């Protein structure tokens, strides 16, 4: 019987749940991050996810997570134990991330940033340097040279910026962030002005940051985009070499499979 892995990317806004086998991440689901949930509510949702994928608890061989929300960790850990009969392994913590962490205080780096950087290096071993750009709650630029995690930059996120603008402006409409054009248009409505301003504004920010990073990283350098808005930004910008929305889930899969080889 094929063993499946349940992978958890526990972020500030959402929990992304991936179902994987040894060779690939097969599918993923996104649930809101809610510290107010109970172990049972999370466990029942996990059973729903598995049922939707045509699986049951007996098909799950391992549960692996990275998290930037410590308050949610024990809830999901207990849910995995009670409903799936599996211990939830965290990276880092239970599973080491084999990168030389050059941060001044290594423990300060978010687990998601390290896992994504590791995944980028494992999936794209050729270039001397890599930049992983994650369009999540924040937009992060994480730099890898060889086997070393150098650090990076943290910028505002697309959705969090849109939410902040909407909450502070009484007359502006809610932003959909849906843009069909490949080039910005001069908006003749507030909605068009906002949507194009956000998508092309973040694309320009990304291009500018990457251009400056290229000036300080030893080349050749390749750029991997991930996160919820990776495809949206990639459609209007040519600054990415690879687009992998599932980059972090791929990293968790690889970390689990290679944990005994190190």
From Swiss-Prot:
K(+) binds at residue 134. Pathway: Cofactor biosynthesis; coenzyme A biosynthesis; CoA from (R)-pantothenate: step 1/5. GO terms for cellular component: cytoplasm. It is found in: Cytoplasm. GO terms for biological process: coenzyme A biosynthetic process. Keywords: ATP-binding, Coenzyme A biosynthesis, Cytoplasm, Kinase, Metal-binding, Nucleotide-binding, Potassium, Transferase. Its cofactor is NH4(+); K(+). One of its GO terms (molecular function) is ATP binding. Its EC number is 2.7.1.33. The active site is at residue 112. It holds the Pfam family Pan_kinase. It catalyses: (R)-pantothenate + ATP = (R)-4'-phosphopantothenate + ADP + H(+). ATP binds at residues 9-16, 137. Transmembrane segments: none annotated. It is an enzyme of class 2 (transferase). Substrate binds at residues 103, 110-113, 190. A monovalent cation. Ammonium or potassium. Its main location: cytoplasm. SUPFAM superfamilies: Actin-like ATPase domain. NCBIfam families: baf, PRK13321.1. Belongs to the type III pantothenate kinase family. Homodimer. HAMAP family: Pantothen_kinase_3. Catalyzes the phosphorylation of pantothenate (Pan), the first step in CoA biosynthesis. This is Type III pantothenate kinase.
